């Protein structure tokens, strides 16, 4: 079988631990036999981020901006325990936070549904997509550990050094903590446009939530700018498409989502989207059953698996144990990136392969071959086998080969 040509590269961002192993298996067994894979490779393992003082992450983000498409493996965001484990000189920043700040985009996450695993929320019939603002808030916050009594103030000066606002945050009588975060109008406006444009593409309603009753400037700004963009740029198109936009407090939307049938885009601020995307994934089946794409305002796309490095499987793997790791989200990331590359280049063969790659793993799972995370959630009558990683990848390759020859 002649391999599919891929003249233009994508940025490939390798990662850590078990997902790094799965990453290599997907490339070697599912992609390279069929495609002349063309990537610019960036090693974002925690060891290489340490060796390069995290410069490799900055370079990877720039590559995505230049090439327009990137695909990222799961990476470690170190805490104190990980710092000691990997002998790090500092707690390096989350690679995702660095990349999202550089691209200033919106993260869209949606569950991968299979009939063998029923959602925990029985009324959900269609996937719920989380649209997460990928800039600012606590991910770009400045923090301070207060050790003694004193006064904390919020001070703003203009570019000429003129004081425009000074507010007392709190008079500390003893130890405590401080955090200051920000966002930008232009980033919020881009977030709104990304959400509404995506909704028109996939024909789904948009629900947006904040807590503007409490945060009367910060969250209120999000609410007002979203409404402005909708009214001035999208209301007519939504009406013609039979779609709706609604705003509500986040606690209200959370309650309504649980009672909905799904099939909506839930637009969230950065932290809210971080939390709710995992909740939607777990309630739909499993965290490794979640697609994730970062879309920037200037048309850049970064695809990744919306889960961690599966450290428990990695440690068992290092002991020589056979493990059964769910590869579907990582396969979906590769499939999404290759399809987008094909769409941008007019490469119909690459688009067709990417679509088959995305379906192959799902069809294997639908036949009852399930990874460890899903096996316990499946009706025993429909469960066939829990294959280890090598066997599961072999089954997916067989299915993909059938599709390519069909």
Residue ranges and their predicted role:
Residues 46-60, 223-264:
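N-terminal small/polar loop signature for handling phosphorylated ligands or for N-terminal nucleophile
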Residues 319-325, 343-406:
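Internal helix-turn-beta structural module
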Residues 36-41, 201-210, 234-246, 342-354, ...:
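Flexible, glycine/charged-enriched surface loops at secondary-structure junctions
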Residues 6-25, 154-248:
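Glycine-rich phosphate/diphosphate-binding loop of Rossmann-like nucleotide-binding domains
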Residues 14-16, 68, 130, 195, ...:
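Buried hydrophobic positions in well-ordered alpha/beta secondary-structure cores of metabolic enzymes
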Residues 257-356, 363-367:
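Glycine-rich phosphate/nucleotide-binding loop
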Residues 2-8, 18, 22-23, 28-53, ...:
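N-terminal alpha-helical transmembrane segments of multi-pass membrane transport
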Residues 47-164, 271-275:
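N-terminal glycine-rich phosphate/adenylate-binding segment common to multiple enzyme folds
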């Amino acid at each position: 079988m002649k391999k599919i040509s891929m003249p233009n590269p994508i940025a490939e961002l390798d990662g850590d631990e078990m997902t790094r192993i799965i990453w290599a298996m997907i490339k070697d067994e599912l992609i390279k036999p069929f495609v002349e894979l063309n990537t610019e490779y960036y090693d974002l393992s925690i060891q290489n981020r340490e060796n390069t003082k995290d410069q490799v992450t900055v370079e990877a983000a720039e590559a995505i901006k230049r090439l327009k498409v990137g695909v990222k493996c799961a990476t470690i965001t170190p805490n104190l325990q990980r710092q000691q484990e990997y002998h790090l000189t500092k707690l390096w920043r989350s690679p995702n936070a660095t990349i999202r700040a550089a691209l200033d985009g919106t993260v869209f996450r949606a569950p991968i549904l299979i009939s063998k695993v029923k959602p925990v929320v029985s009324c959900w019939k269609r996937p719920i997509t989380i649209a997460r603002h990928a800039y600012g808030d606590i991910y770009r916050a400045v923090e301070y550990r207060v050790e003694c009594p004193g006064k904390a103030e919020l001070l703003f000066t203009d570019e000429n050094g003129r004081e425009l606002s000074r507010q007392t945050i709190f008079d500390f009588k003893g130890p405590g903590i401080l955090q200051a975060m920000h966002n930008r109008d232009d980033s919020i406006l881009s977030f709104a446009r990304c959400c509404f444009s995506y909704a028109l593409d996939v024909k789904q309603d948009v629900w947006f939530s904040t807590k503007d009753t409490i945060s009367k400037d910060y969250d209120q700004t999000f609410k007002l700018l979203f409404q402005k963009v909708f009214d001035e740029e999208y209301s007519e198109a939504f009406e013609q498409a039979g779609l709706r936009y609604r705003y509500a407090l986040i606690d209200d939307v959370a309650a309504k989502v649980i009672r909905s049938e799904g099939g909506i885009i839930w637009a969230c601020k950065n932290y809210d989207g971080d939390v709710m995307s995992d909740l939607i994934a777990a309630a739909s089946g499993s965290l490794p059953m979640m697609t994730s794409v970062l879309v920037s305002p200037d048309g850049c796309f970064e695809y990744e698996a919306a889960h961690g490095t599966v450290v428990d499987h990695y440690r068992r793997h290092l002991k020589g144990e056979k493990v059964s790791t769910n590869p579907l989200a990582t396969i979906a990331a590769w499939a999404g990136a290759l399809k987008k590359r094909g769409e941008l280049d007019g490469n119909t063969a690459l688009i067709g392969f990417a679509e088959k790659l995305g379906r192959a793993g799902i069809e294997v799972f639908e036949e009852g071959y399930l990874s460890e995370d899903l096996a316990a959630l499946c009706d025993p009558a429909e469960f066939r086998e829990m294959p280890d990683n090598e066997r599961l990848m072999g089954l997916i390759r067989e299915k993909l080969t059938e599709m390519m020859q069909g």
